[in-house]
Amino acid sequence: MIINCNPSIGREIKKRRPAIVVSANHYNAVTGMCAVCPITDTKYKNHIALDKRHKLQGYINPFQIKTFDFMEKQRNIRFVEKATLAELGEVAQIIDMVFDFSSLLSE
């Protein structure tokens, strides 16, 4: 998807940019929100390269998860294409590491 991330402050996702939706369809439908990870041109450690066959090129930043009201017209959202299962799997692994739910639940 392409989404307008403004307004934002500090080091938050800025401007109109590509992003990958990481929230479940049920969550999106119930809340009218979607959680995304931005896609950037810059390669950093643990960013995930998009498959070369995609229309969009760049790197998924799984460390900067943000929720957006996708019903808000100012977000100017446009669907581009679906991520591969491999890309989603890598993103999910890093998001799991970020939140460390298994550790929280075992305490």
Language-model region placement:
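A broad, low-specificity signal marking well-ordered, structured residues that form hydrophobic/aromatic
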Residues: 1, 34, 48, 58-60
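GIY-YIG nuclease catalytic motif and its immediate N-terminal context
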Residues: 1-9
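Flexible loop residues that form catalytic
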Residues: 6, 24, 103
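Compact nucleic-acid interaction/catalytic patches
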Residues: 11-16, 20-53
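C-terminal terminal-subdomain/extension
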Residues: 52-107
